[in-house]
Amino acid sequence: MINKKLARSFSLYEWLYYLDHFMLDNIDPTLNRVFYVAKKLGVLKSKAFVFIVGGTNGKGSTCHVLENLLLNSGYRVGLYTSPHLMRYTERVRINGFELEHLYHISAFNDVKYFQNDVLLTRFEFITLSALILFKSYNLDIIILEVGLGGRLDATNILSADVSVITNIDIDHSKILGVNRSSISVEKSGIFRKNKIAIVADNNFPKVAQYLAKKKKVRLRIVNIDWIYKKIEFEWSFCSSKITWLHLPLPRNVSLDSVATALSAVSESGIKINQKVFRSCISEITLCGRFETISYNPIIILDVAHNPHSARYLFKKMSSFKKNGNIFAVVGILKEKNIKDIVSPLIPIVDYWYCITLLTHRSATSSEIIKYLPNHNSQISKNMTVALEKIFDKVTNNDIVLIFGSFITVCEANKFLANKVKNFKLL
């Protein structure tokens, strides 16, 4: 519970500044350090049922679908996701709600107290604080989103009852490897012996399958052990556990994420009601995932930040009936594959605005524009300048697309909330 005396030491913003500026990122890549502190904190053994979700894209969406479905089924649920979009407190939710600053401050103090001289990364520190918060509540279920990779991710210190991999694609190559096989080995490190592992990648590398079977993991692979199919305006799901037909399509999250979450829950043995599922999937919304915030003109925010998500974004954008121009604002982090993020969208974007994000991790606008056509691309100083230029010329028939990272969407949200008064925001 909250130690109010300690909690007054730093504000949440002071804590986050400390974590951003004084925590190390390059520490020996093992879980030994975080295991050691977690054991002292008493957070390794939980009575709650644990889902862990990894993959290149769709982790957050799948986690939020799981949360929504399980909450609506009457369970007490803790959710830990990253990164946050607008507020740090988005990262930890208890029964669907964010917690007040004081709870996070108290958890940070506890981690710091038991850390002593043990080195922790920022993400390891934050993950431990989330587990402390979960321990304070009598939860039925904990849902953890993997931060990066899986095998050596701090979330992997808990032994999950059901592990999920949404998909495998190239991202974070310097850490995870340069091909799907090596990446799949890292991501499947979240699998546990004799436990269920849901795989939503229909071309899951053979090496990861071999290692999983060697570990006696109970693999459940899409299109082999479970299938889902969209037919016009509905879809169906079938596995050895359930067959649900004529399901309504989700409105605001991808069908892939919904089907993956349903597979995970059905294999877990946790009881859910089909009627509840049907009603809740149409209500799920997730900020920054092909989020339409205006219709006059259409303004779309998407956190697509790697080649796989950029290709998916192109597919979604191509579904629009184009009556006007598409204006794109793009800001990308410097460690990303810029060329392969922007390339899929070049055929459909009419005007490009490249920005440098307000973070030291940002690629510069000059670095981004190198991969775009000369005739329709320009550099803007920042998000504000780019959007002001666009809004000077945009019409109600046009589309404004803002994408490239979570930070890009965050900066756009701040501008739109404070400055845009003449557009019909949803």
Curated annotation (Swiss-Prot):
Pfam families registered for this protein in UniProt: Mur_ligase_C, Mur_ligase_M
Gene3D superfamilies: Mur ligase, C-terminal domain, Mur-like, catalytic domain
Catalytic activity: 7,8-dihydropteroate + L-glutamate + ATP = 7,8-dihydrofolate + ADP + phosphate + H(+); (6S)-5,6,7,8-tetrahydrofolyl-(gamma-L-Glu)(n) + L-glutamate + ATP = (6S)-5,6,7,8-tetrahydrofolyl-(gamma-L-Glu)(n+1) + ADP + phosphate + H(+); 10-formyltetrahydrofolyl-(gamma-L-Glu)(n) + L-glutamate + ATP = 10-formyltetrahydrofolyl-(gamma-L-Glu)(n+1) + ADP + phosphate + H(+); (6R)-5,10-methylenetetrahydrofolyl-(gamma-L-Glu)(n) + L-glutamate + ATP = (6R)-5,10-methylenetetrahydrofolyl-(gamma-L-Glu)(n+1) + ADP + phosphate + H(+)
Note describing how the cofactor binds: Binds 2 Mg(2+) ions per subunit.
Residues noted as binding Mg(2+) 1 in the record, renumbered to the chain: 82, 145
Positions bound to 7,8-dihydropteroate: 121-124, 152-154
Residues noted as binding Mg(2+) 2 in the record, renumbered to the chain: 172
PANTHER family tied to this protein: DIHYDROFOLATE SYNTHETASE-RELATED (PTHR11136:SF0), FOLYLPOLYGLUTAMATE SYNTHASE-RELATED (PTHR11136)
Family assignment from sequence similarity: Belongs to the folylpolyglutamate synthase family.
NCBIfam families assigned to the protein according to its UniProt record, in alphabetical order: folC, PRK10846.1
Name listed for the protein in its UniProt record: Dihydrofolate synthase/folylpolyglutamate synthase
